[in-house]
Amino acid sequence: SEGRSRLLGAPVPVRENDEGLQRALQFAMAEYNKASNDKYSSRVVRIISAKQQLVSGIKYIMEVEIGRTTCPKSSADLQSCEFHDEPEMAKYTTCNFVVYSIPWLNQIKLLKSSCQ
């Protein structure tokens, strides 16, 4: 496993349009919205930083700014949800998410979620 061990290691930056990153972020936001007791859904405003780390799967380490949308929790298509106009309603927050993904086993889990 000489070749494999070289791949493991430090987190490296990942492009915002990376498919795995997008999936990880979507998953993190779904979990965030599930756990929040807000009646509105939140979604990502912008990605501040994103890294991936190859362990026995892929760990995505993300710092994102999220905002509260005008859509209730039940709404399916979050991407088309508008953000609240009033800043105190929009509640922009910076969150750190760590998602662990093993795509070939179809496994994904949120390891860390902390928002300021």
Swiss-Prot record:
Q: Which UniProt keywords apply?
A: Disulfide bond, Phosphoprotein, Protease inhibitor, Secreted, Thiol protease inhibitor
The membrane spanning regions, by residue number, are: none
Site Reactive site — annotated at G9
Under the heading Pfam families, the entry gives: Cystatin
- Asked whether the UniProt record includes Phosphoprotein among its keywords, one would answer yes
Whether Secreted counts among this entry's keywords is yes
| Secondary area of contact, short sequence motif: residues | 53-57
Q: Which residue positions does Phosphoserine occur at?
A: S80
Q: What is its main location?
A: secreted
The record, for SMART domains, names: CY (SM00043)
> Which GO cellular component terms, listed alphabetically, does the Swiss-Prot or TrEMBL entry include?
cytoplasm; extracellular space; vesicle
Q: List the disulfide bonds.
A: C71-C81, C95-C115
**Which cell locations does it reside in?**
Secreted
From the UniProt record, which GO molecular function terms apply? cysteine-type endopeptidase inhibitor activity
Function according to Swiss-Prot or TrEMBL: This protein binds tightly to and inhibits papain and cathepsin B.
Record-stated family = Belongs to the cystatin family.
Q: Write the protein's name.
A: Cystatin
Protein's organism: Coturnix japonica (Japanese quail)
